[in-house]
């Protein structure tokens, strides 16, 4: 295929091994790679934007090697993509990749994910965009994941990938030889038991540290083929999960299932 102009971002920051592996994998295939990502880790920031302080950027080419132009940005992952598209890039990219995330982005957790938010910002701007994660916080071999991600992205581009559709890719944390297959999946609904650890700082003031434990993974009830596996079950079986996600969150159920609307309070008689 002809070389693509690819923008890469993440939420783990400019020093993360995952984003370097992804950028190198794209470059090896002859694509033109630009990186705009947070200057430090900003995981779980969702689709937040910076409104009360200026955004600052610094060149970071030396972290990625020859041929890759890179910037570290003081903002969120969504800030990075928005700023790249508006100010930093000379041309609109053909493809936006976010990752490789150090840890999973499965099910309803994607609402908290900065990785997914960076890709979603691209989707909102009608650029084909994919979020990429390795489903383990301890896994360090990102080279194989980078190759898998590029294979999938190139195939999707060749197959006329709808720019309004975000692809969320999760790769199991195992050697490539042990990965079984790739399948389309549905988002699961993840339920957590939230735990806050109460601590005391050196000045005697209390603070809280959030932790959480997954207690339930439910298959979503959304529209789509009912025989699709959930993304969580796919990863548990050492299979690659690819989930199509739309930015339109509008509910498409039956009107009769909604609460009744009473207009009497607007102009009471």
UniProtKB/Swiss-Prot annotation:
Catalytic activity: a ribonucleoside 5'-phosphate + H2O = a ribonucleoside + phosphate
Subcellular location: Cytoplasm
S-S bonds: none
A Pfam family the protein falls into: SurE
Domain of life assignment: Bacteria
Cofactor note: Binds 1 divalent metal cation per subunit.
Binding residue positions for a divalent metal cation: 11-12, 43, 101
Record keyword Metal-binding present: yes
GO molecular function: 3'-nucleotidase activity; 5'-nucleotidase activity; exopolyphosphatase activity; metal ion binding; nucleotide binding
SUPFAM superfamilies, A to Z: SurE-like (SSF64167)
Keywords for this protein: Cytoplasm, Hydrolase, Metal-binding, Nucleotide-binding
Stored InterPro entries: SurE, SurE-like_Pase/nucleotidase, SurE-like_sf
Listed EC numbers: 3.1.3.5
Main location: cytoplasm
Any single GO CC term annotated in Swiss-Prot or TrEMBL for this entry: cytoplasm
Cofactor: a divalent metal cation
Job of this protein: Nucleotidase that shows phosphatase activity on nucleoside 5'-monophosphates.
Family indicated by similarity: Belongs to the SurE nucleotidase family.
Protein name: 5'-nucleotidase SurE
Natural source organism: Prochlorococcus marinus (strain AS9601)
């Amino acid at each position: 295929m002809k070389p693509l102009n690819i923008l890469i971002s993440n939420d783990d920051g400019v020093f993360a091994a995952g984003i370097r592996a992804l950028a190198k994998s794209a470059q090896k295939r002859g694509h033109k790679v630009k990186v705009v990502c947070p200057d430090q880790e900003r995981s779980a920031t969702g689709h937040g934007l910076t409104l009360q302080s200026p955004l600052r950027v610094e060149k970071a080419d030396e972290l990625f090697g020859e041929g890759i132009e890179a910037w570290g940005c003081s903002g969120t992952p969504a800030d990075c993509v928005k700023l790249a598209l508006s100010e930093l890039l000379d041309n609109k990219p053909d493809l936006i990749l976010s990752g490789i995330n150090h840890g999973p982005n499965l099910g309803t957790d994607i609402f908290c994910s900065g990785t997914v938010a960076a890709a979603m910002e691209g989707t909102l701007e009608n650029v084909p965009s994919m979020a990429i994660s390795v489903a383990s916080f301890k896994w360090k071999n990102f080279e194989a994941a980078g190759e898998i991600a590029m294979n999938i992205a190139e195939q999707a581009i060749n197959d006329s990938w709808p720019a309004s559709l975000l692809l969320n890719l999760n790769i199991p944390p195992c050697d490539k030889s042990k990965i079984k297959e790739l399948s389309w999946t549905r988002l699961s609904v993840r339920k957590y038991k939230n735990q806050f650890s109460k601590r005391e700082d050196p000045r005697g003031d209390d603070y809280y540290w959030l932790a959480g434990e997954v207690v339930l993974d439910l298959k979503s009830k959304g529209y789509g083929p009912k025989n699709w596996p959930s993304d969580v079950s796919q990863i548990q079986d050492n299979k690659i999960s690819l989930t199509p996600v739309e930015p339109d969150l509008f509910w498409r159920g039956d009107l009769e299932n909604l609460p009744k609307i009473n207009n009497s309070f607007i102009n009471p008689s």
